[in-house]
């Protein structure tokens, strides 16, 4: 894979073969995810930076957020790639082989092990695995995403993984968005409390996210200093060489 590189203003361009011509690495990566080959991963090959996210709702949201924050994704040649919450590590490995910068944001999933009274820190461990840090042991007692906030686990993990461009939701996109932009969203959805707004958005996610974004478009810039915007700003800095 040969890539034409240039600085942020498009000058001082040069060509390089990523990973010294990493056909073996790319081949191995594609073999692992051959069942989901599509135009989306192909798009990432020609990007200056890639933002890996969960699904369609995140694609809609981050396109809208970037526009509200005056971040021109096309000019910066940044791609938003949905991995459907499954293949973050595989995508990351391919992008690393191509020497294409990336960041990611994933849900803080908690899952119960089948047939056992144990709970897996699925979201946390997904992140820790990607950055090469020892994963959490399963919990012997029932836990929730909110428990990882109150007991400090989310903060501790985030401080480590954010350095590598890996970001963990406090819960998920819908919950985090309502918590960061509560007043605007409650008014837009005509809901009385955050929980009812969250539950509404978690059903028919992409459809309702699209409708919501139209209603809160003028308020999205208020997310500029929150956790939702951090991975986007992180990738922009990398692409600009800052």
Q: PLM ranges: what are they?
A:
Residues 1-242:
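Acidic, divalent-metal-binding catalytic cores of TOPRIM
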């Amino acid at each position: 894979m040969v890539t034409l590189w240039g600085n942020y203003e498009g000058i001082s361009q040069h060509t390089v073969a990523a990973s010294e011509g990493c056909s073996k690495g790319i081949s191995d990566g594609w073999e692992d995810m051959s069942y989901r080959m599509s135009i989306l991963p192909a798009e990432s090959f020609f990007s200056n930076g890639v933002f890996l996210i969960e699904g369609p709702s995140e694609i809609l949201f981050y396109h809208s957020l970037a526009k509200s924050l005056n971040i021109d994704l096309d000019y910066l040649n940044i791609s938003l790639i949905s991995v459907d919450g499954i293949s973050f590590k595989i995508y990351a490995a391919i992008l690393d082989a191509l020497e294409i910068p990336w960041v990611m944001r994933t849900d803080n999933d908690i899952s119960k092990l089948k047939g056992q009274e144990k709970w897996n820190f699925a979201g946390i461990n997904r992140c820790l695995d990607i950055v090469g840090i020892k994963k959490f042991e399963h919990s012997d007692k029932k836990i929730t995403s909110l428990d990882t906030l109150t007991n400090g686990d989310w903060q501790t993990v985030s401080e480590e993984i954010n350095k590598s461009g890996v970001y963990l939701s406090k819960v998920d996109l819908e919950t985090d968005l309502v918590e960061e932009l509560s007043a605007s969203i409650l008014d837009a959805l005509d809901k009385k409390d955050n929980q009812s707004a969250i539950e509404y958005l978690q059903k028919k996610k992409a459809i309702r996210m699209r409708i919501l974004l139209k209603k809160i478009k003028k308020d999205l810039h208020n997310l500029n200093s929150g956790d939702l915007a951090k991975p986007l700003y992180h990738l922009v800095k990398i692409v600009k060489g800052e």
